[in-house]
Structures are given as C-alpha cells and as structure tokens.
C-alpha cells in the first residue's frame, strides 16, 4: 500500500515537472501575448500623443521607450 502511494506521488511530481518544462520551451502563453500587445498599444498611444505637441519623432519614440514613473 505504501509503495503504491509513493509511486503515485512520484508520477504526479514527474507530470508536474514535464508540464513546466514543456510550457517554458513551447509557445508563449496567452497572458504573455496579451501583455506584449497591451505594451505595444501603450507605446503607440504614447508616441501619437507626443507627436501632437512635438514634431520630432525620434525624441517621442525615445521618451516612450523609457517612460518616467509617476
């Protein structure tokens, strides 16, 4: 009885490790994709808002790449 319990726990542990390894080496998760798209949208909005006041595109891009925290 005790050995079957140990083997069951070992199988669960191995399944957990395999799932984590596959998720790291595989495609990005949905949250990572959404986070990247949200960051890209924030950057585009920042550049567009900056260009309304400043004609220099390069300065706006640099300012939006390294935003100053509030």
Swiss-Prot record:
Keywords: Disulfide bond, Ion channel impairing toxin, Neurotoxin, Potassium channel impairing toxin, Secreted, Signal, Toxin, Voltage-gated potassium channel impairing toxin. GO terms for cellular component: extracellular region. Expressed by the venom gland. Residues 1-26 form the signal peptide. It is found in: Secreted. Disulfide bonds join 46-64, 50-60. One of its GO terms (molecular function) is toxin activity. Residues 27-42 form a propeptide. Negative results: has no effect on other potassium channels, on sodium channels, on bacterial growth and on smooth muscle tissue (a known assay to identify possible bradykinin-potentiating peptides). Has the structural arrangement of two alpha-helices stabilized by disulfide bonds (CSalpha/alpha 2(S-S)). Voltage-independently blocks potassium currents on hKv1.1/KCNA1 (IC(50)=217 uM), and hKv1.4/KCNA4 (IC(50)=71 uM) (expressed in CHO cells). This is Potassium channel toxin kappa-KTx 2.5. It comes from Opisthacanthus cayaporum.
């Amino acid at each position: 009885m005790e050995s079957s319990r140990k083997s069951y726990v070992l199988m669960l542990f191995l399944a957990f490790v395999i799932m984590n390894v596959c998720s790291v080496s595989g495609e990005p998760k949905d949250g990572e994709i959404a986070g990247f798209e949200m960051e890209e949208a924030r950057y585009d909005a920042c550049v567009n808002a900056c260009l309304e006041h400043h004609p220099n595109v390069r300065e706006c891009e640099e300012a939006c790449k390294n935003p100053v925290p509030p």
